[in-house]
From Swiss-Prot:
<keyword id="KW-1003">Cell membrane</keyword>
<dbReference type="Pfam" id="PF03899">
    <property type="entry name" value="ATP-synt_I"/>
</dbReference>
<feature type="transmembrane region" description="Helical">
    <location>
        <begin position="41"/>
        <end position="61"/>
    </location>
</feature>
<dbReference type="InterPro" id="IPR005598">
    <property type="entry name" value="ATP_synth_I"/>
</dbReference>
<keyword id="KW-0472">Membrane</keyword>
<keyword id="KW-0812">Transmembrane</keyword>
<feature type="transmembrane region" description="Helical">
    <location>
        <begin position="85"/>
        <end position="105"/>
    </location>
</feature>
<keyword id="KW-1133">Transmembrane helix</keyword>
<dbReference type="GO" id="GO:0005886">
    <property type="term" value="C:plasma membrane"/>
</dbReference>
<protein>
    <recommendedName>
        <fullName>Uncharacterized protein HI_0485.1</fullName>
    </recommendedName>
</protein>
<feature type="transmembrane region" description="Helical">
    <location>
        <begin position="14"/>
        <end position="34"/>
    </location>
</feature>
């Protein structure tokens, strides 16, 4: 079982690196077109990406017994959901998102990448 978990941990570490690089690439591409849209896109992307990173940390990098793994999974998912809501509220209320379309495109793209990249890495 530990071999499977270590393989999954390695795949998620790669997924986080790939997704971080994609954030930078997308930001630079959009920045060349319109600066404020690039910032709003990044806020949306980070609103989904940072809770995903927190989820991965709680599941794979905290010491816990095997019997409490399922409880940790549910707890991590709840924390991820709450953090996502907090980041969206912060972005809209205090960071003054102007282009909501760019914000939610970044958010949805991060959600898709959070699911697709680990699946692709698992197939390789």
């Amino acid at each position: 079982m530990s071999r499977i978990l270590s393989h999954a941990k390695k795949n998620y570490r790669k997924a986080i690196v790939i997704e971080s690089l994609l954030l930078v690439v997308f930001y630079l591409l959009i920045y060349g077109w319109q600066r404020q849209s690039a910032v709003d896109f990044s806020y949306g992307f980070l609103s989904a990406f940072l809770p995903f990173c927190t989820f991965i940390f709680i599941i794979f990098y905290r010491k816990q017994n095997f019997s409490t793994k399922l409880t940790a999974l549910y707890r991590a998912e709840a924390i991820k959901f709450i953090l996502t809501m907090v980041f969206i509220i912060i972005a809209i209320k205090w960071l003054f998102v102007i282009n909501f379309i760019a914000f939610f495109v970044g958010f949805l793209l991060a959600l898709v990448l959070n699911n697709i990249i680990p699946l692709i890495l698992n197939k390789i």
